[in-house]
Amino acid sequence: MKPNIHPKTYQVIFQDVNSGYRFLSRSTKTSDETAEWEDGKTYPVIKVEVSSDTHPFYTGRQKFNERGGRVEQFKKRFNMD
């Protein structure tokens, strides 16, 4: 592998702006805003709009398309059973 080609990664806190849920992870992105984590250390905070705490797939509140696909809609429109 070539040396010095990989981006530098940092420990950061990701915070869901909708629920306030926070988790610590690694990222190449950093921020000027910081916060103290449970271990007593200070980390940059990156705010996200959707996380596993609020995404419908993970919360079980997802909606399914009950109208059917394009073929089913076409058949229904032209009475082709």
Curated annotation (Swiss-Prot):
InterPro entries: Ribosomal_bL28/bL31-like_sf, Ribosomal_bL31, Ribosomal_bL31_B, Ribosomal_bL31_sf. Keywords: Ribonucleoprotein, Ribosomal protein. The gene is rpmE2. SUPFAM superfamilies: L28p-like (SSF143800). It comes from the Bacteria. Belongs to the bacterial ribosomal protein bL31 family. Type B subfamily. One of its GO terms (biological process) is translation. GO terms for cellular component: ribonucleoprotein complex; ribosome. It holds the Pfam family Ribosomal_L31. This is Large ribosomal subunit protein bL31B. HAMAP family: Ribosomal_bL31_2. One of its GO terms (molecular function) is structural constituent of ribosome.
